[in-house]
Amino acid sequence: MWGLCKNHFPSNKIQVQERNKALKPKKSGSEHKTKQLFPVFNCKKKEKGVMIRFAILRNANTSLLSARSICLFTQAPTYCHVRLNTLNKSITTKRNSLTESKRHVHDGKHFFTTPHQQQQTKLGEIEEGHSPNIKEEDLRSIGQAITHQRNKRRKQIWSAIFGGIFGVIIGYSLIYKVIYLKEQSFLPLFPSSKIRKLSTRDLKKVDINQVQKLSKLRVLEILSGHDMIKEQYGVPLLDKDGNSPTLNEFSMWCEDQDPCVTGIVMEPDDKRDSSHTWYRIPFVCKWRITHRPISIRGTIDDLLNRIGLETADLFEIISPERVYGSFKYEYPLQGDSHALHLWFHGEIELDDDSLIVYNGKYHVDVKLQEIDLFRREKNGQLVQYVLYKNEAGDK
């Protein structure tokens, strides 16, 4: 330290003069005399326009510690210099941060952090010894948790929707119509086929034995006038034993003309006798599963009647079923206003290789639709012969 300070504090007069001559140009007048009496130590800081000037007496006895303190003080910046440097650094930092934020503001991955900070974080984690696989597992678990939460929320929404629909339907059909209005209510469930077996109620209205006899007579009447039957089987038509042919099989079913649905019928629990089989909820209602047709025309009529109109006010439909002799007036079902057709199917065996198959509809009389002859030829091939077909009849 002494070697640093002795150059600034010369020990004799000769050294003082030589140093003053080398460092300072000569000045005229009193300024030159003053500098000979007071040798000057100049420490100039050209940075930011700051200069520090300090003068020490030539003949003063200065200790080593004092010289060291004076040297350090002359090299230290002033308060203004420190404040200017601090302000410049803060302005530069803010300018850089604003530039980076504007540059990366549209990047969704760095919404809360800048890419530079994220890279520093990743480098810090790697330096500390964290494995990148743990990061991937955490991200995967977070993604699975988010997916599970979304699925759960979606199920809750759909459950609320279906629960609301179910509550409205049950409330209107059961509570309002059955319990409050004391009326019958029908709750449709799913579509059903138009064709169905005859119920016990239908069998009470139809004499199956009569339909069977009438259909057999109509078939034998048509076959007796057919040329092929006359030539190959003869008239009157007999079976292999020489007797009148008998029916081997006969069946009947019904077919609705309108689309049908399967649903639940609910009525007030009045404990009256009925031909149907009911399931009862005590003191609430009774219900059963049934099939019902959907009449488009009847639905339109109901809607128009509710607003005070009729179909005749808008248009007039002339239906063949309204004509006398059609099904609706030949075989009306009590309590039912929809068209219902009764079909039958029968088989008559002539011999071991010949079989008569026919089908038709029954209203008041039997109406045959088709008569076929199935015969096995000598070469073993089974052949179908169409003997009669009602082209005008609709199936």
From Swiss-Prot:
Its main location: mitochondrion. GO terms for cellular component: mitochondrial membrane. Keywords: Membrane, Mitochondrion, Transit peptide, Transmembrane, Transmembrane helix. It is found in: Mitochondrion membrane. The chain crosses the membrane at residues 161-181. It is a single-pass membrane protein. Belongs to the AIM39 family. This is Altered inheritance of mitochondria protein 39, mitochondrial. The gene is AIM39.
